[in-house]
Structures are given as structure tokens and as C-alpha cells.
């Protein structure tokens, strides 16, 4: 595990302990009962693939450890609507506060503002967090293989499935991919960012994609800024992308989302 992931795990474990002391599992289950049913995160992406379209998981992210503040005028409901209007299939919403200035209420508000399924983007270590995710309205959780053992990943996956949520399993190298493929989740994310150095290269996705059988749905993550980047990854068999920073920095988020998905030339030809 990288140094940054170790630091994150330390504060996450403290956060979880504090949350458990404040909100019981029974409380979370009561909150879940008040949420609308999961919207089918994987199914929304699979439908795009089957139709021959790019699938976009559009990220609502205020800040990051590597870039600092990304969007000062941060309005999760407005961003959710803008992404939906631009053609995004799903949302990803940061709920981690120390590193990303995220919050649970951002997830709840963004999902309520549109009809798209939403991922709780956070660092998951305990099943309590899975119940938090569903209580806050999430349709999917993220599992980062670099920070979990195989047993932990399976336990979190199975808990998520039991609540009707999907699971995006994230990897960065070949050993992590081999471990991810032992899980039953069909959603595999390849993070092009090295969490030790923060360097980003699309070659990571291109290299690892060949390891994955056709019954899985691959998601390219990080370093995707243009339609040309999407086309490049498509050549490697990746038709689904998680994009945050490059869209969050644009004034017209809807137009930027559409341009990423179909290209400026296609828009100009309309």
C-alpha cells in the first residue's frame, strides 16, 4: 500500500469509529428504508455499451490532494443536472472530506437532482461504510484493491450486493487486476494515476485491458480530458470512462460533457 493510502486509512478508521459512536447500524438501516431503490449503476453503463455509445461516469469533485481546489462555485445538484443534460450515464460523488472536501450531503443532493445512478466515491474499509452509502442514496460503491485484502474486498462487495448496490473495483497494476478478477463484480476500473507519484498515463489502461474477459465492463479512470482520449482507450477495448477534473473546470459543464462523449466535430456538424 502506498504512503498516501496508509495515511488515508488511518484517518478513515478514526472517522468510522466516530461515526459508529454517533449513528448506529440500526439508524443507517432506518435511513436506507427512506431511500428510493438502487437505480442500477452497472445496468446504465451496460446499456450504453450495448447501444454502441460511450458510457460516462461524471464526477462531482470540489478538490483533490494533487490539485487542491478544483471548482470554487461548487453546486452538486446543478452539476448533476448539467452532467445528465450532457449525456452522462452515471454520477460519481466524493464523500471524503479531508482529502477531497467531499460530504455525504453532496451525494444525497446530487442524486436527488437527477435520474442518474450515483457512486459513493470514497475509501471503503468496513461494511459500516457500505450501509452509510446506501443510507445516503448511493447506487454503487468503490473498492480500491491497493488498500484492501482479498477477503476485505469480497466482504465489502457482498455487503453491497446484499443492499442492491453495484461495485466498481479499482486497480492500477497487473497483480491488482488478477485479484479483482477473482471477485464477481462485472465493473472493473483501471486508474491511470499512480497513487504513489500522482503521475498519470493512459498506457496503464491500454496495458491492463488485455487481461480482462468480455464478461466484465472496463472503466478508464484519470487522465481522460478529450474525445480523442476516449477514442484512444476505445481502441484498447474500453468504452466507459470516469471523468471529473477536466469537466469540473469548465464553465459550461453540459457542453463539455457532450463534447467529451461525441466530439467537437460531431457537434459542429449538427
Swiss-Prot record:
Keywords: Amino-acid biosynthesis, Aromatic amino acid biosynthesis, Decarboxylase, Lyase, Tryptophan biosynthesis. Transmembrane segments: none annotated. Pfam families: IGPS (PF00218). GO terms for biological process: L-tryptophan biosynthetic process. This is Indole-3-glycerol phosphate synthase. One of its GO terms (molecular function) is phosphoribosylanthranilate isomerase activity. Pathway: Amino-acid biosynthesis; L-tryptophan biosynthesis; L-tryptophan from chorismate: step 4/5. InterPro entries: Aldolase_TIM, Indole-3-glycerol_P_synth, Indole-3-glycerol_P_synth_dom, Indole-3-GlycerolPSynthase_CS, RibuloseP-bd_barrel. Its EC number is 4.1.1.48. It is an enzyme of class 4 (lyase). It comes from the Bacteria. It catalyses: 1-(2-carboxyphenylamino)-1-deoxy-D-ribulose 5-phosphate + H(+) = (1S,2R)-1-C-(indol-3-yl)glycerol 3-phosphate + CO2 + H2O. It comes from Rhizobium etli (strain CIAT 652). CDD domains: IGPS (cd00331). Belongs to the TrpC family. The keyword Amino-acid biosynthesis applies. Gene3D superfamilies: Aldolase class I.
Amino acid at each position: 500500500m502506498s504512503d498516501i493510502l496508509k495515511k488515508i486509512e488511518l484517518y478513515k478508521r478514526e472517522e468510522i469509529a466516530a461515526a459508529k459512536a454517533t449513528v448506529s447500524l440500526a439508524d443507517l438501516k432506518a435511513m436506507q428504508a427512506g431511500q428510493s431503490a438502487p437505480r442500477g449503476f452497472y445496468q446504465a453503463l451496460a446499456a450504453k455499451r450495448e447501444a454502441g455509445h460511450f458510457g460516462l461516469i461524471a464526477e462531482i469533485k470540489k478538490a483533490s490532494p494533487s490539485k487542491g481546489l478544483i471548482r470554487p462555485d461548487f453546486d452538486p445538484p446543478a452539476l448533476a443536472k448539467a452532467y445528465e443534460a450532457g449525456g452522462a450515464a452515471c454520477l460519481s460523488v466524493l464523500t471524503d472530506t479531508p482529502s477531497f472536501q467531499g460530504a455525504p450531503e453532496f451525494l444525497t443532493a446530487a442524486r436527488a437532482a437527477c435520474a442518474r445512478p450515483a457512486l459513493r466515491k470514497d475509501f471503503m474499509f468496513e461494511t459500516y461504510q457500505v450501509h452509510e452509502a446506501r443510507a445516503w442514496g448511493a447506487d454503487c460503491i468503490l473498492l480500491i484493491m491497493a488498500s484492501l485484502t482479498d477477503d476485505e474486498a469480497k466482504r465489502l462487495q457482498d455487503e453491497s450486493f446484499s443492499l442492491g448496490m453495484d461495485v466498481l473495483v479499482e486497480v492500477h497494476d497487473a497483480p491488482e487486476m488478477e485479484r479483482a478478477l477473482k471477485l464477481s463484480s462485472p465493473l472493473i476500473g483501471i486508474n491511470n494515476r499512480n497513487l504513489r507519484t500522482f503521475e498519470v498515463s493512459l498506457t496503464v489502461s491500454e496495458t491492463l485491458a488485455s487481461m480482462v474477459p468480455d464478461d466484465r465492463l472496463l472503466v478508464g479512470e484519470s487522465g481522460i480530458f478529450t474525445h480523442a482520449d476516449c477514442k484512444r482507450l476505445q481502441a484498447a477495448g474500453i468504452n466507459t470512462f470516469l471523468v471529473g477534473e477536466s469537466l469540473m473546470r469548465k464553465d459550461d459543464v453540459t457542453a463539455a460533457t457532450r463534447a467529451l462523449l461525441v466530439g467537437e466535430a460531431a457537434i459542429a456538424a449538427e
